[in-house]
């Protein structure tokens, strides 16, 4: 047995599961992305099994078959449920509450074995989850191929192009991110008047935007992907809340990495940006 295989998962009689071919599950984190994925799968004719820690799990009620709520991140139980329901593939979508990484009492023994030997950041945690899932014969699927229309293109995305000043600021911000991203932090930052005002750490982009708004009354937000992030489940994501927070903090331009950033609820994002006169720009992809 693989050292990360869930030993107490029930044995499934696959002979009686022909109707469950290509059954897909979603490990649903926070945010609207897992909802979008679940809706799309349901539209394609088969509602996914949804496993989530979310307190608002009922939002999946009509687009999950079945919906499994969990109070704590028990990966053993999640794998058992997927195997019990004949799941062959899983999609991991949504934000992971980063604070749980520092509360080991929440995890089951399977995850604790990993936590004791990996870096305590969300990317390492997600990679460990993927390793365990795949060792149990369940493949991890990319969600960007299910929702290709959400992938940010290059160039102007909103109602107006950036000003020369905004472009100088986001080009500078992108050059800074290229330096700090290999250090496993700083997926996003805010630049105002050629100076870095705030850099994202474990608090997340939204909190970083709020922090920047307390320091300056203007600026641009730049968001890019780390080279060690997995394109299947760890793409940077922006959505309506991003624009709302930018508006509250006085930021006037959003620059994201094209092809490696998702814009969730795109039409709403563009409408909010237009109302607040926020420019949105797709930076050239840093794909290797």
Predicted regions, residues:
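N-terminal positively charged helical leader segments and presequences
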Residues: 34-67, 88, 98, 109-116, ...
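N-terminal basic/disordered segments at the start of proteins
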Residues: 9-53
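Short coil/turn connectors at secondary-structure junctions
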Residues: 19-23, 44-47, 85-88, 136-138, ...
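Conserved mixed alpha/beta catalytic, RNA-binding, or beta-rich assembly cores of soluble enzyme
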Residues: 41, 123, 139-244
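Feature captures the catalytic cores and cofactor-binding loops of soluble hydro-lyases/lyases
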Residues: 53-85, 103-114, 207-288
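N-terminal glycine-rich phosphate/adenylate-binding segment common to multiple enzyme folds
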Residues: 78-146
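Short glycine-rich anion-binding loops that position phosphate/pyrophosphate groups of nucleotides
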Residues: 30, 95-98, 195, 226-227
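General beta-strand structural signal in soluble alpha/beta enzymes
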Residues: 26-28, 50-51, 90-93, 122, ...
């Amino acid at each position: 047995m693989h050292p990360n295989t869930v030993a107490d998962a029930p044995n499934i009689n696959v002979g009686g599961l022909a109707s469950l071919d290509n059954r897909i599950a979603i490990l649903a984190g926070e945010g609207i992305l897992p909802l979008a994925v679940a809706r799309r799968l349901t539209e394609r004719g088969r509602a996914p099994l949804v496993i989530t820690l979310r307190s608002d799990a009922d939002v999946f009620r009509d687009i999950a078959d079945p919906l499994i709520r969990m109070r704590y991140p028990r990966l053993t139980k999640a794998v058992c449920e997927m195997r019990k329901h004949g799941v062959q593939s899983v999609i991991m979508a949504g934000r992971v509450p980063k604070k749980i990484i520092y509360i080991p009492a929440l995890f089951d023994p399977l995850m604790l074995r990993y936590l004791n030997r990996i870096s305590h950041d969300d990317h390492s945690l997600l990679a460990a989850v993927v390793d365990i899932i795949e060792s149990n014969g369940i493949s991890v699927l990319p969600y960007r191929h299910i929702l290709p229309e959400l992938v940010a293109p290059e160039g102007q995305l909103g109602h107006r192009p950036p000003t020369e000043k905004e472009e100088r600021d986001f080009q500078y911000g992108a050059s800074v991110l290229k330096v700090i991203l290999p250090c496993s932090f700083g997926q996003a930052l805010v630049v105002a008047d050629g100076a870095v005002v705030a850099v994202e750490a474990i608090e997340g982009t939204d909190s970083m935007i709020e922090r920047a708004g307390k320091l300056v009354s203007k600026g641009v937000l730049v968001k890019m992907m780390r080279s060690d992030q997995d394109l299947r489940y760890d793409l940077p994501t922006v959505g309506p809340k991003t624009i709302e927070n930018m508006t509250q903090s006085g930021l006037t331009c959003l620059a994201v990495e094209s092809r490696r950033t998702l814009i969730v609820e795109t039409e709403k994002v563009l409408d909010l940006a237009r109302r607040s006169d926020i420019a949105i720009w797709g930076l050239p992809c840093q794909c290797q």
